[in-house]
């Protein structure tokens, strides 16, 4: 059997994932013993003694063989026995979960996979079922596909089946090594997706993004401002302190507004290390759209890419002239 890795986002993958449904085998019904009415019919009518000495000389009547009994009597007795047999209640068929429940499970599996990958632990399918899916095992294919799509769009990762025999999975980085080195944030890959999501929102807004708008987007990923997360911990502290201290974000109060509101801007380090075209590619991957779906932002990204290319050519020109001399 080939152990070639397979992407879960591939629609052909569904045919290769083992069936997640568990088939329960019902007990085979056993034969029904003949009821008392059948024994009475087989015994026949009692024989009355004849004469004064008949009681002593009478012998018991010969037993009637079952082959000599009218088949209608047997059928009637069997139906009577089935009528008195207690019937086991039918097992209710579970209703399929709502799409929102499958999405929630997909988010739970996404964070589970990210944590396992950070700890350099093997991703086994049975562990996913036991620790995350639980009673949703019948819908494991749908949950795996949704999880793979979220990982690819948000974090630039692919969830691949690396060994079909042992059902071992692995996370494969979809971004190029140069892009990963530029925004890896000390090799904490989940942080990359979190940062790119916020920077993308700021870029689409044009100048800055209010804190409320940022949290509306992060809630889609299951992140809450005042709730500890299994992967990130204190998410609010990360985006308002860590990213700010690393100069990836600016976090400023909006003037002349009560109660106080805050907004995010690109930091100096983000402007140096992350290009607008990379943000456009990230948005296209997340929303499954062409970058030209944001025409003004796409033109701006093209202009920046052209300017960077010209600057690189200008920087290389003196070196080439010196080498020729």
From Swiss-Prot:
Protein name as catalogued: Necdin
Signal sequence extent: none
Organism superkingdom: Eukaryota
Quaternary assembly: Binds to the transactivation domains of E2F1 and p53. Binds also SV40 large T antigen and adenovirus E1A. Interacts with nucleobindin 1 and 2.
Keyword Cell membrane in annotation: no
Keyword Transferase: no
MAGE domain segment(s): 102-301
Location of the protein in the cell: Cytoplasm; Nucleus, Nucleoplasm; Nucleus matrix
Pfam families on file: MAGE
Gene: Ndn
Keywords for the protein's UniProt record, in alphabetical order: Cytoplasm, DNA-binding, Growth regulation, Nucleus, Transcription, Transcription regulation
GO molecular function, one term: DNA binding
Chain intervals for the UniProt region annotation (Disordered): 1-69, 77-96
GO biological process, one term: central nervous system development
Expression sites by tissue: Brain specific. Not detected in other tissues. Expressed in postmitotic neurons. In adult brain the highest expression is in hypothalamus. Highly expressed in thalamus and midbrain. Relatively low levels are in cerebral cortex, hippocampus, striatum, olfactory bulb, cerebellum, pons and spinal cord. Also detected in neurally differentiated embryonal carcinoma cells.
Function field: Growth suppressor that facilitates the entry of the cell into cell cycle arrest. Functionally similar to the retinoblastoma protein it binds to and represses the activity of cell-cycle-promoting proteins such as SV40 large T antigen, adenovirus E1A, and the transcription factor E2F. Necdin also interacts with p53 and works in an additive manner to inhibit cell growth. Also functions as a transcription factor and directly binds to specific guanosine-rich DNA sequences.
Principal location: cytoplasm
GO cellular component, one term: nucleus
